[in-house]
Amino acid sequence: MASGSDTKSDDLSTAILKQKSRPNRLIVDESINEDNSMVSLSQAKMDELQLFRGDTVLLKGKKRREAVCIVLSDDTCSDEKIRMNRVVRNNLRVRLGDVISIQPCPDVKYGKRVHVLPIDDTVEGITGNLFEVYLKPYFLEAYRPIRKGDIFLVRGGMRAVEFKVVETDPSPYCIVAPDTVIHCEGEPIKREDEEESLNEVGYDDIGGCRKQLAQIKEMVELPLRHPALFKAIGVKPPRGILLYGPPGTGKTLIARAVANETGAFFFLINGPEIMSKLAGESESNLRKAFEEAEKNAPAIIFIDELDAIAPKREKTHGEVERRIVSQLLTLMDGLKQRAHVIVMAATNRPNSIDPALRRFGRFDREVDIGIPDSTGRLEILQIHTKNMKLSDDVDLEQVANETHGHVGADLAALCSEAALQAIRKKMDLIDLEDETIDAEVMNSLAVTMDDFRWALSQSNPSALRETVVEVPQVTWEDIGGLEDVKRELQELVQYPVEHPDKFLKFGMTPSKGVLFYGPPGCGKTLLAKAIANECQANFISIKGPELLTMWFGESEANVREIFDKARQAAPCVLFFDELDSIAKARGGNIGDGGGAADRVINQILTEMDGMSIKKNVFIIGATNRPDIIDPAILRPGRLDQLIYIPLPDEKSRMAILKANLRKSPVAKDVDVDFLAKMTNGFSGADLTEICQRACKLAIRESIENEIRRERDRQTNPSAMEVEEDDPVPEIRRDHFEEAMRFARRSVSDNDIRKYEMFAQTLQQSRGFGSFRFPAGGQSGAGPSPGAGGGSGGGHFTEEDDDLYG
C-alpha cells in the first residue's frame, strides 16, 4: 500500500473491495444445532430484519452460491452473527468468519417432485433401501426447504450418507411437503466430480495483488452486473483487460477466479490452439469463440499467452499471424455495445504485442501483476498452507520476509517442498509395499519450521533461475579484520532493506553502489559473498568478461537483461567482479569491434541512473586497477562509496589467521600472534596459503607415518599388537616454520605505494580535511573551507601522470 500522503486516492482505488455494512450481512458462526435446514439468529436481529421463527430465508454465499433454510432464534448468538452447521457452510462455500447476506424468501412453493442421488463413497457397502432408512425419516413432517445443487448429510443406521439434490420441480428451490414425490434412482454421484466444483478458485485463493484485483473487479463485475451504471453516466463500459507480469504471479488464476465469482460464462482460448494449417481456418476459430461467447452472455473470453497469436505485425514474417491480429482487432471493435462480453488476455511479454491492440476500446486497461511484497507473500503463504498441517513453531511471517523476489508459484513450490521434507522424515515408518499406512503415522505428520528452512535453502526465485548463484556460505566470521568496511557494507545493504522507514523519516534515498579497490588477495570478493549471505537479499554475480560477446549489440543487451532480472528480484545485490574489464576509461581502446566496450559502459551508466528508487538494487564493484576505470562510473549516485581495502595490519592478520585455522587442530605452542607480527606486508590470500601449506605438511607426515607403521606390522606381526595413538594429532610449530620458508608476498612495496597514493588522491582531491561550520553563527569567521584540504591534495595531482608510468 502507498504511504500516508496518498491514502485518500488509495482508498478510492480499492473501494470496490470494501464490504458495505448492511443489516442483512452477517458473520458465519459455528452452529450448536445439528439440523441441516436450520440457521439461527439473535432475536434482536430477527426483529430488525422482520423475520419470525420458522420463516424461510435465502442465504447468499461466495461464488454465487445460495441456500434456503429455516430461521430460528438463539439468545446466545450475538447480533451480527448467524449460526449454521457445516453442511450449510459447504453449500454456501463459506468458512467460519466469512460474511454472507440473508433475505426473507416468503414465496417458496411446495415441491411436486425432487430428484436426489447419493454420493458414491458414502453408500459403499450399504444394503437395504436408502429411501426407507435415510430419506423418509429425514424429510417426514419436516417441511424442509431444499435448493437444486445442495448436498445434505443424513445420519441413520450407524452411518452418515451424503445426498445431492439433482433436480427440483418447481426449480430452483422448493419445500419438501408430505405429498412431494422423492426420486432416488440412478447411479450414485462420483465424489471427484463434487470435489472439483468445491475446489474452484475464488477471490480468497488469490493473495498478494489486492490493488490489481480491485481494478479487475471494477472492470469486470460492474459492467457485467450493473451495465445501467455506465448507461446512466453516459460512457461505454470498458471491454478489454490485459494482464501482464512475470511468470507465476497468478494471471490465469485471476481470470479463473473472476469467472467463478461472477458466474459468467468463461471461454478460454489458449494462444497456440487457434492456429491451423488451413488458410482462413485460424481466423474462423477466433470468430467462433466470440460468437459462442455472445450467445452465452454475460461472458468472459480469456486469451492466454496473447503474444503467441498477436505479435507485432511488422516483426512477423508469417502471413497467418498478421491475419489473426487483424481478425482480433475487428472482432474487438465489433463487439456490440452492451453485449456483456469482456475480453481478458494474459501475457508475460507485453511489449511484443501488436500496438494496435493496446489502444482504448480494445485492451484499454493494462494491469501489471507484479512480484508481491512481503505482506503479499504472507497472504499467499497463508492461502497455500490453509489445508496443511503445520506445527506450532512455524512462523509464516518470517518465511515471507526471507523469500524476496518469489512469486506465487515459487511460494507454492516452497510449501510443497516443505511438506515433502516432513514426509521424508517419517519415511522409515512408511513401507511402499503396504496397502495402507498406519493412521498413527498419518496423524503424526506435521510440517515444522525446520522443513520450511530446508525448503528455503533449496528454492530460488524463478526470475533468477538462469543467473542463479549459490549464495555462498561465507559469514562475517570468515573474514578477519576489516571491521569498518563490514560496518559500512551492512549500513549500505541492510539498512534500506530492514529499516526503510528511517530513510523516509530523514527524507533521503539510500545510496546505490560501492566500489572496493585495493591490492589483490585482500578479500574484496569475499566481502561481497559475505554480504550476500548475511543480509537476506538475492545475489547476482557478474563476471566482467562474460558480458562481452562477438555480436553487435549483444553485450549491451546482456547488461540490460541482468539489470531487469535484478529489479524483478529486488532486494538484490549485483556484484561486478573485475570491474576494470568492462568499465575501462572510454576513448582509449580503438579497434575492439566498433567500440563494444564503450557501449557496454554507456549501457551500465544509464542502467545505474535508471534504477528506480522503489526497488532495492545495490551494486558492488571490485577491482584492483582503479586507475583505469572510467571516471563517470565513480561519481556519487552511481558507485558513490569508494572503499579502499588495504593490506591487513597486524590485528587483522591475527584475525585472518584465526579465521583460517578455526576448524583445524593446532598445537598449543604455536604462537599465532608472533606469526601475525612477522608477516608484515602479506595479503589475506598469502596468509591463507601459509595455513594451507602447514596443513599439507602435517597431512604428509601423518600419511608417511601410517605407511611406515603398516610396513613394520607386516615385518614383525607379533610386536604391533598395541594400537598406537594418532602420530600427528595436530599442526605443530615445525610445520608452520617449514611453511614460512616457502611463504612469499604477492604484492610488492611498489604496488602498495601506488594503491595508497591513489587512495589519497581520491580522498584529498575530493574531500575537505578541516571543514567546520563557523562557531556562534558568525559567517566567515573560520578558516576558508577547504584551504587545508585543497592544498593538501595539490602535491599529489602533479604526480598523477606518472603513478603508473
Swiss-Prot record:
Q: How is its activity regulated?
A: ATPase activity is inhibited or reduced by lowering pH from 9.0 to 7.0, and by addition of Ca(2+), EDTA, KNO(3) or by treatment with N-ethylmaleimide (NEM).
Q: Which residues carry this modification: Phosphoserine?
A: S3
| Reaction(s) catalysed (UniProt annotation) | ATP + H2O = ADP + phosphate + H(+)
InterPro entries according to UniProt: AAA+_ATPase, AAA_ATPase_CDC48, AAA_ATPase_domain, AAA_lid_3, Asp_de-COase-like_dom_sf, ATPase_AAA_core, ATPase_AAA_CS, Cdc48_dom2
**Post-translational modification, as annotated:** Phosphorylated.
| Family matches, as Gene3D superfamilies | 1.10.8.60, 2.40.40.20, 3.10.330.10, 6.10.20.150, P-loop containing nucleotide triphosphate hydrolases
Q: In which tissues is it expressed?
A: Expressed in at least oocytes, liver and kidney (at protein level).
Q: Compositional bias (Gly residues) at which positions?
A: 777-795
Which Gene Ontology BP terms does the record give? autophagosome maturation; autophagy; cellular response to arsenite ion; cellular response to heat; DNA damage response; DNA repair; double-strand break repair; endoplasmic reticulum stress-induced pre-emptive quality control
SMART domains (UniProt xref): AAA, CDC48_2, CDC48_N
Subcellular location(s): the record lists:
Cytoplasm, Cytosol; Endoplasmic reticulum; Nucleus; Cytoplasm, Stress granule
EC assignment: 3.6.4.6
Organism domain of life: Eukaryota
Q: Where does ATP 2 bind?
A: G521, C522, G523, K524, T525, L526
Q: Where is this region: Disordered?
A: 708-727, 768-805
Q: Could you name the Gene Ontology cellular component terms for this entry?
A: chromatin; cytoplasm; cytoplasmic stress granule; cytosol; nucleus; site of double-strand break; VCP-NPL4-UFD1 AAA ATPase complex
**Any Pfam family:** CDC48_2
> Which terms in the Gene Ontology molecular function aspect does this entry carry?
ATP binding; ATP hydrolysis activity; identical protein binding; lipid binding; polyubiquitin modification-dependent protein binding; protein-containing complex binding
The entry's ATP 1-binding residues are P247, G248, T249, G250, K251, T252, L253, N348, H384
- Chief location of this protein? cytoplasm
**Keyword annotations from UniProtKB, A to Z:** ATP-binding, Autophagy, Cytoplasm, DNA damage, DNA repair, Endoplasmic reticulum, Hydrolase, Lipid-binding, Nucleotide-binding, Nucleus, Phosphoprotein, Transport
- Assembly information from the UniProt record: Homohexamer. Forms a ring-shaped particle of 12.5 nm diameter, that displays 6-fold radial symmetry. Interacts with the FACT/DUF complex, which contains subunits ssrp1/duf87 and supt16h/duf140.
Q: Return the similarity comment.
A: Belongs to the AAA ATPase family.
Role played? Necessary for the fragmentation of Golgi stacks during mitosis and for their reassembly after mitosis. Involved in the formation of the nuclear envelope, and of the transitional endoplasmic reticulum (tER). The transfer of membranes from the endoplasmic reticulum to the Golgi apparatus occurs via 50-70 nm transition vesicles which derive from part-rough, part-smooth transitional elements of the endoplasmic reticulum (tER). Vesicle budding from the tER is an ATP-dependent process.
This one is known as: Transitional endoplasmic reticulum ATPase
Question: What's the source species for this entry?
Answer: Xenopus laevis
Q: What is the lineage of its organism?
A: Eukaryota, Metazoa, Chordata, Craniata, Vertebrata
